[in-house]
Amino acid sequence: MSHSRYYFTSESVSEGHPDKVADQISDAVLDEFIKQDPNSRVACETFVTTGQVIVGGEVTSKGIVDVQTIARKTITEIGYTKGEYMFDANSCGILSALHSQSPDINRGVDRKEEIADEFDRVGAGDQGMMFGYACTETPELMPAAIQYAQELVRLLAEIRKEGKIMTYLRPDAKSQVTLEYDGNDNVLRVEAVVVSTQHDPEPAGMSEAEFQAVIKNDVIENVIKKVIPAKLIDENTKFHINPTGRFEIGGPHGDTGLTGRKIIVDTYGGAAPHGGGAFSGKDPSKVDRSAAYAARHVAKNIVAAGLADKCTVQVSYAIGVARPISIYINTHGTSKHGLSDEQIQEKAEAIFDLRPLAIIRRFNLDRPHGWCYRDTAAYGHFGREQFPWEKTEKVAELKAALGL
């Protein structure tokens, strides 16, 4: 293995970023449909811009959802509640353009024949490939750069909502973390942290430069140093806080937001492959979402069981077909106990049922308890213990199957 050092970078965005506003509205609409009718089929897309929200997509459900009320509630909770933001929950226009799903798709998902057991009853909602990943870089078994990037913007939002310090904060923000690794893929240190946060105008009597200096110090002391372990920060670590200076205009007024445009933020920060399908606004019959959750579950249990230090899982489907077309597991040369990837994959395939209905039942994706889909729509779908696909309950079964 090479011993040359290298850098790796991941980014995240806050719940107030326009693309994340769109994701959260889409998932809040999905939550309401699922709550009223667990068998709802939903593909909900949201567009947000200055003073306007458009919600569209395809739905088959017995539920009746007030899209306007849900969108305004979501925007309020994110924090867009002032007219000066040019995107205000109370005054923005909201257009709903949801319509019924194609019966051709529904026919493929709800199968009526070729059934060996009940889990063969539901075919995949579309073709495609999905990836899951886990590694030992953090306690959450997530890549470190994305984990830190998510925690930075999450803490920034908590501080903003608490309103005790940094009272100038506005909802939009981004983070980026660059780590230095040794040739054995161990994190050595933080090379750079970038945080851009929207803020109020500078107070009277304070120049832009003075205000930005205050913001920089506050972000370093109250956010970065609370999230990133002190041992990883040294005198050469670079902090770029609002590097362009003033950041007053932001959110959907600064940039148009769309559902599904932050798929790398949602997953592993570029540390693992991505099948290309977004998550938010999609009911669990859509394998873009449910199978990506299941693939993470498989990868995390393999790493948690001590079978490998890294694990990538790929699963693929054909529309209307329940059983995966292919499953692929790669431990990147980090497998333990003399195990081959083939041995690990053989046991994993026997233990983890990756048919869509089996995934839905295993995680109660049609009846979420203790979480909701909107919870997933900001700060990452993985590495957060509240979600059932993060459980490592299969560790003992995996180890026993492999004679460990």
Swiss-Prot record:
Where does this one sit in the cell? Cytoplasm
Q: Which UniProt keywords apply?
A: ATP-binding, Cytoplasm, Magnesium, Metal-binding, Nucleotide-binding, One-carbon metabolism, Potassium, Transferase
Q: Where does Mg(2+) bind?
A: 19
Supply one GO CC term from the record. Answer: cytoplasm
- Domain of life (superkingdom): Bacteria
Cofactor annotation remark: Binds 2 divalent ions per subunit. Binds 1 potassium ion per subunit.
Q: Which SUPFAM superfamilies match?
A: S-adenosylmethionine synthetase
Q: Which GO terms describe its biological process?
A: one-carbon metabolic process; S-adenosylmethionine biosynthetic process
Stored CDD domains: S-AdoMet_synt
Q: Where is this region: Flexible loop?
A: 101-111
EC?
2.5.1.6
Q: Which residues bind K(+)?
A: 45
Has UniProt tagged this entry with the keyword Magnesium? Answer: yes
Protein task:
Catalyzes the formation of S-adenosylmethionine (AdoMet) from methionine and ATP. The overall synthetic reaction is composed of two sequential steps, AdoMet formation and the subsequent tripolyphosphate hydrolysis which occurs prior to release of AdoMet from the enzyme.
Subunit relationships: Homotetramer; dimer of dimers.
Q: Could you identify this protein by its name?
A: S-adenosylmethionine synthase
**Which species expresses this protein natively?**
Chlorobaculum tepidum (strain ATCC 49652 / DSM 12025 / NBRC 103806 / TLS)
> What's the name of its gene?
metK
